[in-house]
Every structure is written in structure tokens, then in C-alpha cells.
């Protein structure tokens, strides 16, 4: 692969960082063509720069990941070219501010996704590609009607109220088809027949986010009670049905895809309640940890000889510990646990939602949809590491593939928090001090105490009464083979002494006990960190109130 492409992408990444720090408060526009019937210009402002920075980071990771995941494919040059077209069309959609450039970028995004899903050229990929392109072409039609009705009503001064309502409806339908909202959600699980690097890019920061980016660019046009109600209802239905489907789905990639669909519904609901900027921040954090999650699942599929059925995965204790830790951290971010990047936007959205008055059925569906996020995340983790059969598993010899998503994991944990401290104005910090910290302390103390008493006590009772007492003392007193037991103990001790390191490293994560110990240690770390941060912000709040 040509190294100049990586250098070009890295240069764009550095330029995006420069623009964030020095022109974050300025909106720049560059005009290339300006005629009466055709205008081509790009706009550079804070949202487009931030999204392009995250897209560049994810694209670099996907490019490197593709060189290892698809190293033996014959059509790799075709894949690489279509991937660059796909990413370039998303960049063009982000920075475009004219009808012509936006339509061209929108069409290129759907067409390139068709060729990428069609990469493996089998029955599943052909069916998924056709489903994807037909649904996206329907969205292209809605977007064309939206721009046409807007221009027509502005030129001929017809019934503006009717045309504004029609334009808003076409805008919603176009964004619903591209972001796979209800009832246009069928193409997203079928698009999982594409290679896993493409799934990582599509479900993090490109195709499914394009509809939300479009509706955020025209957020002033949806300030209508009926339009907002449609957005909220569609977002809640998408969350609920995708979360329920993720609980019963067995295909690993489809489970992660349905979790993406649930988060897109969550972001659409956030736009509906009037928090467009908060929804944008949630998209940024989701792009980071979801691309990392897809890479880790793709690594496990690649090492398991392409096996995607979750029922055939279990007891993957031989997976490198760093991959297991990354998978756990990304699932924490997906659930929006405290002091992760997902919590920066998710907790504020939940607080804002439950501080308003909605219908009981509507609020219950939203609550259960959020709660089911923990359900399918735990099911995914349990299916990997907490069962008792053994799959065929081949390790990757590449260190780069094992540690590729490290940068995405670090950004998933610290980047949004750093932005919230330095650049954003999201009042989510005081939520922890006023409400979440006491509740967090109580819940964490109860959970840690229950796990320690339940697991450690059961382990001690089993090891002492069942294993050690029955096999050692009772066997020796009954058969009086003290000398044989003594020699056998010496032999066993010697073998254990020489093979302890290898045996421990291979069997560390195979049992429920050790998994529970690791989870308890991670939760204890979060507890200590929460105590320190809560004390710090409590002091800051008292100083602010005193002033």
C-alpha cells in the first residue's frame, strides 16, 4: 500500500487540529462557483471541523486495520479505491453548504456504500447491497424533492406554510432513510455482509450519521410542533425495536449494528427535544467507541476463521488481555457509565428528558430502551468470556493488529471529557455532584460488597470443603497412602513451579471467578476516581456559590 496516502491523511488530521484550536469560533466560507443556478461552496466551522477530525482518526485506523484483515484478498485495490471515495463523499457532505454539492455528496455516499457492501460477491452481500442502495436511493429522491420544493416556493411565493411543512417532511424522510430510522431500518443489519473494516467505518462516523448531520444543518426548519413530535416518536421506536432485536440476535456483527441503530435513535430523539448540539457531541463520542468495538469484534471473527455466530463463541480466555480490556472499556462507553465519554452527553440527555413531561408510554419505552443497552452489552461480554466450551481460535501474529484500537480507546475515555473541560459548555459536571455521586456511591458499595461476599465466599467454600477437604484429608485417612501422597505432592509442586507462569497466563480469564475479580477491580478504580472528581467539583461549586 502506498505510504503517501497515509501521509496525506495524517496531514489532514494535523490541519484539523490546527483549525480546532485557532478558528473554532470563526465560520469560514470558500466560494468556488457562484452562478444564479449553481453554487458550489464549502463552510468551515466548529461542528464540521470536529466531525472531520473524528472521521480522520477513524479512517486512519480503518485503513491500517484493512491491510491486516483483508491482506489475502485479490480485489484489495478495488476495495481501497471505493473506501477512499466513500470517505471523501462524507467529507464533502460535512463541509458543503450548497444544494448541488450536498446532492452530489449524498449520491456518492450511497453508491460507494453499494460497491463496498458488494465486495465479497456472494448471495448475502448481493442481497445486502441491493437493499442498501434501494433504500438510499429513496432517500436521494426525498432530498431532491426537499431542495426542489424549497427553491420553488422561494421563487414563486406560493403558500409558504404548506411548502415549509412539505419541505420539512421531505427532509425528515431523507434523514430517516440514510440514518436507518424506523421504518427504514431493514437495510442496516443486511449491510453487515460487508467486510468488518467497512462496518466499522459505516456504523461509526459515515453513512448512518449522514442523516443526522443533514437534519442538524437544517435544524431551524424543524422548529414545528408536529415535526418535532414525529422526530421524537421515530427516535423512540427505533431505540426500542433495535434494542429488543439486539437481545435475541446471534450474529455478532448484527448485534453491534443493532446497538448502533439504537444509538442513532437516541441521537434522533435528542434532536427532537431540542438538543441538536448535545446530539452532535453524542455522535462524536459514539463514533470513537463504536469503531473501536467493531475492530475488536472483527479481530475475534478474523482469529476464529470467519465465525460470526455468537453461539459458537465462549471461553475466549486465550485472547490477549489488552483486547479484552479494550472490549470492556468500549462496552462501558456504550452503556454510558459514569466518567466515560458516553456519559458526558448521555447523562445530560437523560436528565433533560426526565425533567420534562411526556406520555407514560413514551417515557417507559425510552427508559426500557436505555436499560436494554446494558442487557445486550452484558450478553455480548458473557457470550465471549463466560461460557464453558472452546472454539477454534488462531492468534494474530501482528502486534499492530492487537494494539491498533488503543488510540481510539484513549480518545473514547478522555477526549470528550477534555473537550468538556476546555471547549464545550455542557452542564453535566454538576449532575454528578448533586445527584449521581451519592447514588453512585451507594450502588457501587452494594455491588462491590455483594460480589466480594458472594463470589469469594462461594469460592472459599468450594475449594476448602469440596476440593481440598474431600480430595486430601478424606482420601488420605481412608486409604492410608501417606507416602504416595507425599511423593505425588512433591512431583506436582515441581511441575507447578516450572510451569506456573505459562499456565497462569493461559488460564487467567477462563473462569467466572477471575472475570469477577477483574470487574471488581475496574469498578473500584472508577469508585476512587469518582470520589476524587466529586470532591474536586464540590469544592469548585462551593467556591462559585460563595463568590
Swiss-Prot record:
Its EC number is 7.1.1.2. It is a multi-pass membrane protein. It catalyses: a ubiquinone + NADH + 5 H(+)(in) = a ubiquinol + NAD(+) + 4 H(+)(out). InterPro entries: ND/Mrp_TM (IPR001750), NU5C-like (IPR003945). One of its GO terms (molecular function) is NADH dehydrogenase (ubiquinone) activity. Disulfide bonds: none annotated. One of its GO terms (cellular component) is mitochondrial inner membrane. This is NADH-ubiquinone oxidoreductase chain 5. The gene is ND5.
